[in-house]
Amino acid sequence: MKKLRVAACMLMLALAGCDNNDNAPTAVKKDAPSEVTKAASSENASSAKLSVPERQKLAQQSAGKVLTLLDLSEVQLDGAATLVLTFSIPLDPDQDFSRVIHVVDKKSGKVDGAWELSDNLKELRLRHLEPKRDLIVTIGKEVKALNNATFSKDYEKTITTRDIQPSVGFASRGSLLPGKVVEGLPVMALNVNNVDVNFFRVKPESLPAFISQWEYRNSLANWQSDKLLQMADLVYTGRFDLNPARNTREKLLLPLGDIKPLQQAGVYLAVMNQAGRYDYSNPATLFTLSDIGVSAHRYHNRLDIFTQSLENGAAQQGIEVSLLNEKGQTLTQATSDAQGHVQLENDKNAALLLARKDGQTTLLDLKLPALDLAEFNIAGAPGYSKQFFMFGPRDLYRPGETVILNGLLRDADGKALPNQPIKLDVIKPDGQVLRSVVSQPENGLYHFTWPLDSNAATGMWHIRANTGDNQYRMWDFHVEDFMPERMALNLTGEKTPLTPKDEVKFSVVGYYLYGAPANGNTLQGQLFLRPLREAVSALPGFEFGDIAAENLSRTLDEVQLTLDDKGRGEVSTESQWKETHSPLQVIFQGSLLESGGRPVTRRAEQAIWPADALPGIRPQFASKSVYDYRTDSTVKQPIVDEGSNAAFDIVYSDAQGVKKAVSGLQVRLIRERRDYYWNWSEDEGWQSQFDQKDLIENEQTLDLKADETGKVSFPVEWGAYRLEVKAPNEAVSSVRFWAGYSWQDNSDGSGAVRPDRVTLKLDKASYRPGDTIKLHIAAPTAGKGYAMVESSEGPLWWQEIDVRAQGLDLTIPVDKTWNRHDLYLSTLVVRPGDKSRSATPKRAVGVLHLPLGDENRRLDLALETPAKMRPNQPLTVKIKASTKNGEKPKQVNVLVSAVDSGVLNITDYVTPDPWQAFFGQKRYGADIYDIYGQVIEGQGRLAALRFGGDGDELKRGGKPPVNHVNIVVQQALPVTLNEQGEGSVTLPIGDFNGELRVMAQAWTADDFGSNESKVIVAAPVIAELNMPRFMASGDTSRLTLDITNLTDKPQKLNVALTASGLLELVSDSPAAVELAPGVRTTLFIPVRALPGYGDGEIQATISGLALPGETVADQHKQWKIGVRPAFPAQTVNYGTALQPGETWAIPADGLQNFSPVTLEGQLLLSGKPPLNIARYIKELKAYPYGCLEQTASGLFPSLYTNAAQLQALGIKGDSDEKRRASVDIGISRLLQMQRDNGGFALWDKNGDEEYWLTAYVMDFLVRAGEQGYSVPTDAINRGNERLLRYLQDPGMMSIPYADNLKASKFAVQSYAALVLARQQKAPLGALREIWEHRADAASGLPLLQLGVALKTMGDATRGEEAIALALKTPRNSDERIWLGDYGSSLRDNALMLSLLEENKLLPDEQYTLLNTLSQQAFGERWLSTQESNALFLAARTIQDLPGKWQAQTSFSAEQLTGEKAQNSNLNSDQLVTLQVSNSGDQPLWLRMDASGYPQSAPLPANNVLQIERHILGTDGKSKSLDSLRSGDLVLVWLQVKASNSVPDALVVDLLPAGLELENQNLANGSASLEQSGGEVQNLLNQMQQASIKHIEFRDDRFVAAVAVDEYQPVTLVYLARAVTPGTYQVPQPMVESMYVPQWRATGAAEDLLIVRP
């Protein structure tokens, strides 16, 4: 406390203005008056000095146009309030404006001043307005335009000028003040004459902590100063005279050069306040005084630093460079050589870099973003010294398929390496490692297969490879419930942008992949108009067009088109945007329908560019997603700090990105003010509405040279702004941004500064070792710096350079050791500072890939395949390899695969190319940091601060149908070509019609190649059935059978159809079909799905095919359709205790609503109160490995059960070997969630610490070790240390949302004590201290855990007292009380019973607790994983306890008897007649669980949760399900509410069979949800605000895991398409909590879905 008081006193004394000097220094004014300001001194001044031809041109352009006043506003110009009148056409500059335009102050009379006319002759300006004045502005009708037009009448308007509050602040947030080139520290002042400034030097040992807490803010609040100023010493206090011009915001410099206390090396904090004022918060800035420029290139293992003089750009020798961690400890240091270069080891803990010499200090924060190099072509795969090329035959799989991965290991130059094992990790979409294996090569090829579970989570999966260098390589693949496409669709527009007057046309080509045109097929689609903000790909980040323009985003038209006999068509739309001045794009989203309604969807875009050139704007600060209170939506837009300067890059560019020269760009800063009010209407009640007022805050003119990027900056306060740039051709571009909104930021957006660009040009397309590179370097300005040749491992060559205005030509010899392909040339050129011109140092960067690819090592691979073949035949691929020089390569290995193009087209899969992988351009491998973005500029432009992350939940709602999808994928074994470079591979092709892409990869020890070819697979007559993905019992559907004659002869065919399984034909099948050559016909087949769960099958026999010279057998085809019940599965539970002689029978109506064929059950009979251990194991086994708690809970049964025990319980389990392997995997997963401090987090080690779960997981790991599993000692030790910390320092625990923090901490401490005591590692003193806080316990469980720990460690007395108290302390039954221990009354009782039995304590109390627990468990229909595991642990300890019983049952003629509980699995017939009689002389406990599918929709129900479903069209309007046509898109809107916070809600919306999801994870092949109407966009905005953890698009359901806050509705939206005509039952939507399963809801039932053709 004493230190805090001292710091506070020091700050107060400092703020009192105690000057160390007798005379206050005077601030230096550095802003030279602008030409406009000078002109203001004349009576009627004009800055418009135009030549006669220029005047004539302007007059001609405005000929015949009317003169009107467009705007009359107060604007800030050169820091002063200015009245600006904007006219529609140029004014005559020769008239006396003071005679025709008058400004009168209502209080003081006429306002004196001179009118200034802008260069474009359209704006009149009157400067230096007084604040808070009512001004009457009168414009006489005599005002004359250049074309001689005049006002029709006099104009008068009253405006009130803004209030001006005295203000002062630092004008730069840069941290480096180059004293040799900048005279002082810049400040911005308005009507403040004197300031007191206090300078603090940050203590060296506190520097990293200070920087971390400072966060580069621009003010220091009093409450922040207590903590921050403890880390700094006050070294100087001074008063400075500013004396800015009255009512004018001026930039001035505080002279620091003669202040001796600031000449000591260090980092300083300046805190400023207006003299004589004491504010809650004061302007502050952090800076160092230094001439040392620093740039750093950060690689994987090293850090290369270059130091230069800010004064002259020369390399600086003898600079001491140090790396510091966040604790201020020096990690490593070195001194720069003659070239200014320092090499340091890259330490992941490095937070700061300090460069010091002769009292100067430069600070580089390595925690800030690296330099943004988006404008450079530096993309590619990462470069490594060991290259591991991973590839497969495809990157899209369905759950249940087997993933295939191949790999080649080479060095950086593609040369073979010795064989070595490589570790592969299979990673789920949630980031969890599912399996780790070690792969060994065979003949140089690594091969790995991974069978996906049938319920594998959908999304993006990864296989991660580690070659031993701990640099991970990733191979990504999709897992989705997709259907292979049968057709191809090509949509094309014009490649170059159109003008706004042009008609937009898209050509359409559709064909079946087996070769026939899609003639007669329907094309449905939509045409959308959208603004094209980032319109120029060559200028990333620049936005073009007026963001305030209205009606630029809308749906243009719906498309319905039938393709011609060649499968072609055209879609066109006339321009409805001829007057636009902003870039636009027309998007055509087209869906080509099969005869059964299933689509193939593609998109095409047509750009529209409205002028020769347009202004482009790029903010120099980050865009972030924030909640916009004005629109009640989440928006992404740039965010800048309140009270700072908002800086922007400006270009004037054509559509190709060529920067044009321009004079007179008008740049305006506009504040968007909204005045809200309430409005009442009969239809909508009270609605919040607003009036928007655009206030012009500031304005300046900008001239740009060709190929120049201009920069502007403006001071901003809190609020919403728009920056607007208007070109001489009237084109306007604008961007919106927020100031002062970062506190509501909910993203990790970071503003990485883009540097100016150095242009690098090479003299050759590629080089070889021994060549000489001729490099031309052209910098924006002359300067010094360095040029480098870099690899991903570090620099290979560098040289100091001096670039003149005309550029520099440099020769670089290519060293023969540069045998790698991740090389880049990079340059940094620094413009030296110049005090005389107030020019601060400025940096430009160049990066260019250095190609060293050797075409001589490319294998030419020829594939000979048939152009066409029939199904059910082998495909032989002949291969021939050769080299560029014609020689026959030796020992060529080839891997051949053939894959259905209908799979590859969905993801645009590119045939893997090993040559490109090893020799192609790699990603630039360095992160560049430098201080040039932090230099404080003397003339006031703000320098930017920064240079430049399965599961059976799906079965909730019932098992999914089995979907039979024929996916053709064949990968042959590798073959070695013969001495002539030739070989062949034969692949079996089954019953498939379509297109195969044959892909081949070839390699030798040094050379590589690849190729592909297409093969059409088609029968002479093709029969393809179009059917829904599944059906529900009771559905009727109209299947379509397409029969295509691909022969050149007419065919008379007989088609016989039958159905079996769970399908029946509704009408007789067709008999005869006649087809001309090339003709396709469609047969309609009505079917009905029967009750049950399983498959239905359609069989077709096609006979009569006549082929010349062939005897053709009948063609037999079968298609299976998965059938499931229409409504979610339900469970009923019965239980009783029968006394001797009593009989129990199932109630007559108990199973009445169940479909008999789906009904199954389990009967448990026991001589003691039963716990259904089989149920608990099943539920835990069914639960996915997910978060920390789920993973641990799911593993416990595998510790204590084996395959024989599971079989005895009626559970299908894995072998003991697989069971032990799954535990090993689970342990690995748990350890991935262990934090560095030994605790555990919920999802990964970077998450927040979970205190109770840390004890829970440590309990499991200790038990696993006891059961013989390998648990790393280090992990156990670190976990134990963390548990010990819980015992000894409970104050360090922060448990969010805990309703009883003391009880939560007591629960954590007690469990930690038990786990440590189990290992004899719990300090008895700590246990006794916890016992003293026993009154904090909110449940008996922690008291029992503490009691067992006390007894174990030797304090039997306190232990027994704790155990006795535990049995008298029930848990509060209110589930809404959160204690942070994942508990419930049921869970606690179960763990207490388990503890008592494990430790052989109180057998009578055990029996009482068992009886209570049995009743509790029986009453719970749904259990959390915590409860299931606790019940398992309790049941496993008591299942062997004796309890004789005897029973007679209706399903067994023999009498049943036993001493242990017995489970019997029952079918539907046994269940509906079930009777049980107690034929023994002891009580008999009975539990019966039956589950099945209801025959009718369940009634809506809700407990805590509530769910509603709405069906909309893509226009956002309500749509009925009984009036859809095949191909129609519908939007499904789910709204979920909760009366308590539910962080783990799982939403399952089962689909009716006639609808199919448009999978947004497969954007290339699905209709886009984003391309919808305005109402739909509002719903999408609401959805963006939801905390959605996971979304899945399945064959028969939409699934989302989402957090639902109390009384805050969650919106979920998905897109579906009506496909197969028919009548379908509509299931209800469901939602439930995964941890409190009784919190659940079922939505209202819907009418039938009717899909018409």
UniProtKB/Swiss-Prot annotation:
Its main location: membrane. SMART domains: A2M, A2M_N_2, Thiol-ester_cl. Belongs to the protease inhibitor I39 (alpha-2-macroglobulin) family. Bacterial alpha-2-macroglobulin subfamily. Keywords: Cell inner membrane, Cell membrane, Coiled coil, Lipoprotein, Membrane, Palmitate, Protease inhibitor, Signal, Thioester bond. Pfam families: A2M, A2M_bMG2, A2M_BRD, bMG1, bMG10, bMG3, bMG5, bMG6. This is Alpha-2-macroglobulin. Residues 1559-1589 form a coiled coil. A lipid is attached at C18 (N-palmitoyl cysteine). Gene3D superfamilies: 1.50.10.20, 2.60.40.1930. There is a cross-link at C1187-Q1190 (Isoglutamyl cysteine thioester (Cys-Gln)). PANTHER family: ALPHA-2-MACROGLOBULIN HOMOLOG, UBIQUITIN DOMAIN-CONTAINING PROTEIN. A lipid is attached at C18 (S-diacylglycerol cysteine). It comes from Escherichia coli (strain K12). The gene is yfhM. May form homooligomers. GO terms for molecular function: endopeptidase inhibitor activity; protein homodimerization activity. Transmembrane segments: none annotated. GO terms for biological process: defense response. Bacterial alpha-2-macroglobulins were probably acquired one or more times by horizontal gene transfer from metazoan hosts. One of its GO terms (cellular component) is plasma membrane.
